Amino acid sequence: MNATGLHRNALDKFYTKPDIVRQCIEMVSQYIQIRPADLLIEPSAGDGSFIQGMRGLSPNCAFYDISPANSEITQLDFLEYTNSSHENSSQKIHVIGNPPFGRQSSLAIKFIKKAASFAQTISFILPKSFKKESMRNKIPEIFHLICEKDLPKNSFTIEGKDTDVPCVFQIWERRETKRDVIPTDTPSGFRFVVKTVTHDISVRRVGVNAGVIDTNTIDKSIQSHYFIQFTNGKNISDNIQSIQSIKYETNNTVGPRSISKPEVIRAFNEALQTNIE
C-alpha cells in the first residue's frame, strides 16, 4: 500500500502494486460518475501510486500526505484538511486511495469520517475487517456501500518485497437517505462471562485456531479467548454438538485471524435455535 497505508512512519512503508491500483481505478470508473468539474482527492498519497490513475479519471486532482514521497504531493495532514477552497455547489468531491489503518483500524475510521464530512464518494483500500458489520456500522449512515472487492494475496510491497496484508477495496456513496444499520444481536441461550465466573466453554478469539471450542479452560488466556456460560437449560454436550460445526470467516481482518463478539453471537444464536427440540 502507500507509504502511509498501514503505518505512518519511515520504517514501515507499504506500497500498492501498480496492477492493484489499476484494478481499483477501474472499479471507480465503473461505479462512479465523475463529471468534468468534480474534484478527486487522494488523502494519503504516499509515493504517488494513485496519481496516474486518478488523473486518467479527471484533470482536477489534489494529492496530500503528511510525509510525501513524491514531488507532486502536497504536504498536509488530511485530518486537518478544510475544503473551503473547493466550495462550489456544483462540484462533487471524490476521495480515493489508501488511508493509514492505525491500531484496530482507528486511523482508517478517522479518515473515512473526515472524508464523509464533504465527499460525495469514498473509495478506499481498507483492512478486511471492514467486511464485518461491526466495522461498517462505524461509517456515517448517509453513505452506502455500492461495491467491494477482496484484494489478492501479495497486493503490496515493502522494501521491494511482496507483502500480504488482507485488504478489501470498498466504494461508499453519499445518498439522501440513511442506510439500514445492522442491529447488534444479543446472546440467546448463552452469555459471555469473565473467566473467574462459572462457565462451560472457551472459544478461541484470535490466532490460527480462532473459533476452536474447549471445555478445558484452566490454561486459557483471557486475552485470546471468550468464556461462555450456557443458559438454555440443555446439557453442555448437546449445546457443544449444536455449535461445533460453526465456520467463521476468520480472514476478514488484518494481522492475526480474529472473531468478534457479534460474529459469535450470530453464529451461536442460529446454531442453538436451529437445534431446539
PLM-predicted stretches and their roles:
Residues 1-277:
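Class I S-adenosyl-L-methionine-dependent methyltransferase catalytic core
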